[in-house]
């Protein structure tokens, strides 16, 4: 991506999935997404922020194998400060649920929307498929809660920007074009807006379903 850093969504999701990701590539008004052509061979030093033209064989080394998360065999002391993890992908809950943490401090809902649902919530309502959102959200939360039980899981309800909601199927019809989407119609200001409240209720129904049925 041209913008972003170690804590942006692209970085977080890529780390969870174990895939390479280069963010924040804009330099001196040049953007990598436009400067680097399709099929062009380059070497990227992501640690130092350097891009070399062509393949530099002397600096290209095979990546070390990634080790899976395991439970430490030694005694884990109880700390005065609770240790929580962030998790976006429900399919990774079992893998990381075995770690000696106190629970999930932040489970982002957005990953479920973009990876499993793909459609704007208001579009689902208009087409009579509200249950798709409710059931898919609930199933994602169930996986995480089940893997971490009886530890606490904190779910953050959707916090997409209008530009991100617009990328979902049907989103063009419902989303405004804002000069600064980062500071625009998102979060709580969206939840209680009459134009979006029906969609917000789908998220609440999913939470209710998890608590009552699972």
Describe each model-derived feature in a short phrase.
Residues 1-107, 115-120:
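Acidic, glycine-rich flexible loop/linker segments
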Residues 65-214:
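Conserved alpha/beta-domain cores
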